[in-house]
Regions:
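Glycine-rich flexible loops
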Residues: 1-230
Length: 230
């Protein structure tokens, strides 16, 4: 199995293990270097159900290559982002409960933990999930996109970053949604320093490795059964 295809499959199963793949919808993609192509997956299965045959190449017009399997219409914003942001090589959009509920607030995360500091000032809000809406909203350094009443997109220079951002956003959303509205957030003068520290620790690679391991542990040979999250 091609390494990019395997990374997409591992991301599907890993996010499923974290409870972000229980329903139809969402997309994971990785850019194929030097070509207007990406690797994504079929629309008619959940992340929990993905197998090798469900992973395939998609062109930048949103058409599957070499298969007639259906692909999500939402894939349109993926190639739009890849064209606008050459630094982005992987994109994640899921309908996990916490991130989707957070999106209903139509605002960035409140910062309560060191690992969520990288989202401060690098999260945009798009009024819709088409690229005509996302493109103008997306800044040059943004790593997350909130679509109100829909969900969240995370983007990274590779699959490790994109997946780690996604699971970390989900963690931050749980904090934001369960802590009282008057809970003090991290002081602004500390956020940049801590974000620099987080970005330099190898956190994203280690988190990706953890997510991948967890997906493998929760896969029973047929599908992924999500782990219990405290």
């Amino acid at each position: 199995m091609d390494s990019i295809n395997k990374d997409v499959l591992d991301a599907c199963r890993g996010l499923a293990a974290y409870g972000m793949g229980t329903g139809i919808g969402g997309q994971i993609s990785i850019r194929i270097p030097g070509e207007e192509l990406m690797v994504s997956h079929a629309f008619d299965k959940t992340f929990e159900e993905m197998h090798e045959a469900d992973i395939f190449t998609v062109d930048f017009n949103g058409n599957p290559v070499g298969t007639n399997r259906p692909v999500s219409i939402g894939i349109e914003f993926h190639h739009g982002i890849y064209r606008q942001r050459p630094d982005v090589n992987a994109i994640i959009h899921s309908h996990g409960f916490w991130a989707t509920t957070q999106a209903a607030l139509a605002r960035p995360l409140r910062i309560f933990a060191n690992v969520t500091t990288p989202f401060y000032g690098k999260t945009c809000t798009s009024p819709n999930d088409d690229f005509a809406s996302i493109g103008p909203a997306l800044g040059e350094e943004d790593i997350a996109i909130i679509i109100p009443w829909h969900g969240v997109i995370t983007i990274g220079n590779g699959i490790a970053e994109a997946v780690a951002y996604h699971t970390t956003f989900d963690y931050g959303a749980r904090q934001d949604l369960t802590l009282p509205a008057d809970t003090p957030t991290m002081p602004e003068d500390q956020i940049a320093e801590i974000a620099t520290m987080v970005n330099g620790t190898g956190y994203y690679k280690h988190t990706w490795d953890l997510v991948r391991r967890t997906g493998q542990e929760c896969y029973n040979g047929t599908r992924v059964f999500p782990r219990l999250i405290p």
